[in-house]
Swiss-Prot record:
UniProt KW keywords: Kinase, Transferase
UniProt-recorded Gene Ontology molecular function terms: kinase activity
Enzyme class, UniProt record, top EC level: transferase
Domain of life: Bacteria
Keyword Lyase: no
Species: Escherichia coli (strain K12)
Biological process annotations from GO: phosphate-containing compound metabolic process
Gene3D superfamilies: 3.40.1190.20
Designated name of the protein: Uncharacterized sugar kinase YegV
EC number in record: 2.7.1.-
Family: Belongs to the carbohydrate kinase PfkB family.
Pfam families to which the protein is assigned, alphabetical: PfkB (PF00294)
């Protein structure tokens, strides 16, 4: 049933609502680890690859490959990492609205365990050095979808980004807090939620959010209480169990697409990219989440986080589903 619906939706993808992606482009050094290192140990890793990544770049690539045009505010610096990112973006037909900043882009080491779970160690660069001059370059049309990552919101520039968001008129923020949901100060988090964003959380992040907001950790009750407290949409991703969505209009669980998990790097980003592509095309939230599930299932079945599918690849992958 989901596959049939996906085949109906994919040809309809086109940019009907403007999208602005605000966030980071960084380098991911990905390595296999037989176990996570413990204090004082010395373990040998097997390098998989050195990829251009970052939450916002993963989403920009996913949108582009699905045929959605977006404005990409991904700060690029002047160092070796920045040049690698710039070249990678050019190959995807992408440019950044914030380019040639002083300093280099950041990078992270991703350790992938035998079961596919990943652990990140990150080093910040220009992507977390936002200032008012950069923000002044961005033109956000009324009615736009506006993506933010928790990595930037939890960084020292987070308050500046929220101030800018509060000044914008008639926009829909899409926020993927990621693992930084526990690091954002209470006062700033309250201001973010006052903007009534569409929030996407994975299972662990939903538990943290429930605790921070004094809500139930049971998913359906959490969704109901979230609507009562914030009057804003919520997505909770449950891996192979699918994804729940909650809004003032409807709620439900969209099943996951079957796949063989290779690694989970980029799973949340790709899901967000699929959802944004659906929303930008004017699809209802349920269909946008279905598209997010399809994109995420493709990504976790391939190594690395920069492997978002095209529409044609999704059609082929799910032709018999």
């Amino acid at each position: 049933m989901s596959g049939a619906r996906l085949h109906t939706l994919l040809p309809e993808l086109t940019t009907r609502q403007s999208v602005m992606v605000v966030g980071a482009a960084v380098i991911d050094v990905i390595a296999d680890a037989y176990a996570l290192p413990w204090r004082g140990c010395d373990i040998e890793l097997k390098q998989q690859s050195v990829n251009v990544g970052g939450c916002a770049l993963n989403i920009a690539v996913a949108l582009k490959r699905l045929g959605i045009e977006a404005g990409n505010a991904l700060p690029l610096g002047q160092g070796v990492w920045a040049e690698m990112i710039r070249n990678r973006m050019a190959k995807e037909g992408l440019i950044s609205l914030i380019d040639n900043a002083e300093g280099d882009n950041g990078w992270c080491l991703a350790l992938v365990e035998p079961d596919g779970e990943r652990t990140f160690m990150s080093f910040s660069g220009v992507e977390n050095q936002w200032n008012r001059q950069w923000l002044a370059r961005l033109t956000v049309a009324p009615g736009s979808l506006l993506y933010f990552s928790g990595y930037q919101l939890a960084s020292p520039c987070g308050e500046l980004l929220v101030e800018w968001l509060e000044e914008l008129q008639d926009v829909t923020p899409f926020i993927d807090f990621g693992p930084r949901i526990g690091d954002i100060p209470d006062a700033l988090l309250a201001r973010i939620m006052a903007c009534r964003p569409l929030v996407s959380l994975n299972r662990q992040e939903a538990e943290i959010a429930a605790e921070r907001f004094a809500l139930s950790a049971e998913i359906t009750t959490l969704g109901k209480q979230w609507q009562e407290k914030f009057a804003a949409p919520l997505i909770v991703r449950l891996d192979k169990e699918g994804a729940w969505y909650f809004s003032n209009d409807a709620s439900g669980c969209i099943p996951a697409f079957p796949t063989q998990v290779v690694d989970t790097i980029g799973a949340g980003d790709s899901h967000a990219g699929g959802v944004l592509a659906g929303l930008a095309s004017g699809l209802p939230l349920a269909d946008a989440v279905l598209l997010g599930n399809a994109v995420a299932s493709w990504v976790v079945g391939h190594r690395g986080g920069d492997c978002a599918p095209t529409r044609e690849e999704l059609l082929l992958a799910h032709k018999n589903v």
